[in-house]
Amino acid sequence: LKKLGMDYKIKDGYIFAKTNGRLKGNIIKFPKISVGATENSIIAACLAKGETVLKNCAIEPEIKDLTNFLNSAGAKIRWFGRTCKILGTDSLSQTKYTVMADRIEAGTFCVAATLTKGNLEIKDFNSSIIRTELELLKKAGAKIKIDNNKIKIVGPKKIKSIKNIKTKEWPGVATDMQSQLMVLMCIADGTSSITENIFE
């Protein structure tokens, strides 16, 4: 945000930010893929003067949903792989928008069904945003059927171990699903391994 013209200071654990007038567009390359940094930079750039180019962005579904929302309000945001280009506008307008379903919540329910030998159906949900996690649950023995925007999942009688689970930026295994998968693997038959690559 400093590259967009913001001044800030950190005091007592709080960030105090200010700008003299309007933010200005710039070219920014993130040294590390970060969801929070990508989201905040996109929001700030929407009303900045000129064009902002963000490189090495996070591309989680929630970020794409955020940009769809902002575009519906008048923002000018385009994606090119992990590069995001934002042409600043003078203002945003009122809009009506339906926020996407929570993929971590859906994934957690799917793990719970696998864990408890349950029978679960999730409706009005785009399964592609948790396809990596669903593949892991299939390996664990769950029976999964995807029909349009429905997921049907039946937990196995015996849970199979999964070797070499690794969290990664989307479309990899979500770090927020790591603890749920760990619980599942605790009662699996055999030895499993999970590597946390995002927060540790």
Q: Residue spans of the language-model regions?
A:
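Short, structured segments at the rim of ligand-binding sites
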Residues: 1-200
